[in-house]
């Protein structure tokens, strides 16, 4: 319960906010970050707050849902904007913040937003100190605490003290973390008796305890409540003060290179709760908390920096043995599952009409104009939409041409549809990138949810220098996709005349992984046996278990002939869909050029054939 907003993080490291040129947009706010953090660590998390009925509110809500956070108690208000924060990264000491939160949405919660039945289903309620900084929110927050007690829901307090949000500093001084104020201490001391766990920095303990001497502040708190007090001490780790025990419990910190301390406390809290709510020993809770905090401080952003269970486990197992472990590929690959999701969760049926060269050549032969191609592609898109209407349950995707009609199509794409756009100039060997812009800029300007597809040739008969260039280009592309959080589909091309297509495919995939390149999807063509598909699946299992193969049907001329191909591919659990285009639309294109069908007839033909392909897959 509490702050959930949008963080705009300066991308220029070591720069004052005044000099920042570009910003990355993330979900933020103390409570929002923790909701994401605990969800990534396997807890069932829900968000009790408000967002504005604005585009940023849509972003916050959708991001929470994507992270697995329940949003049933997240209300949208038409009268208030979603809060914004500008953040700078100037390590090791300066991390400026500017809060744009005047009368913002997440401070508009009402007592009626606290659903008693939902509370009864919940093991704990986490509240943050900012929720008590205004009179209206104070009343709602106390109502929530009282309801938690009635429903036997544990109360966790993240002190989360920001002087600027209590009106104690100028509006631009968001970086200040500590300023003694008797009235603020008084408000915190109304909260403390209702808490079962209290977490804060040393400075926050001082303000909650109403004293500038830590030991006295701790005593003051424990006179009000018996709850354990967890004190975050940054690079020194943490301490737990239990009432009646003179010496605190301590745990060793993890030594990492600090990039950004903002959000570290939220990572710490997420890790601590992942142990505490499962009744883990105090040492385990502290170990999880210190590890999660350490991982977050090494990254840009707050919510997106939160680790998942797989990362946490790997970090705890290997942090002593591997120097700079957080900059290594093993952690990065595991973290990517949180930022991009898992391909295992995305069975896809992809309709592709990005055959640029084929259409261009066809127009030259038949003396038709580009306008004819554009009109035909619009009908292909209409056919895809018709298929989507008739089969709304399947996950349909489309791969669109970056030139012909992309802008027109993009404005009409249903949000349920996964969209990809090629990045390569086809044909090109070594692979060359589309457009005149640098690769980073080209991908940056595309909608963020769209995936990147590259047609990439690699096999042992290529000259060794070409092989090296292909791998270097692919590594460059994968690096840009990682920086921009874009999913990468590698469409592996091996010539038809290759005598052992299965071995060549295995060798190419292995070479990619040996160069620390991890595609989200592999687009694989081949009429392979079930044994070969399983061998390819083993390569994924060894190198990147969350990646998946998508079967390419580019060599098939008849839809009806796809059944046996689908059956073989589905013998492997690592194949999660198919890509098809030519087999569906090329005959219609040829018939259109010969005036054998009208343009308006194309959508029905396309939809019927695409849906038949989906049925064949589901029956295989």
Task: Spell out what each predicted region is.
Residues 44-129, 313-322:
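Conserved N-terminal subdomain of the carbohydrate kinase-like
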Residues 324-462, 559-576, 586-620:
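Alpha/beta catalytic barrel-like cores
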Residues 1-70, 109, 351:
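Glycine-rich phosphate/adenosyl-contacting loop at the front of the ribokinase-like
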Residues 351, 491, 522, 581:
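Conserved, mostly hydrophobic/aromatic
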Residues 397-401, 450-470, 501, 508-532:
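Catalytic beta/alpha-barrel core
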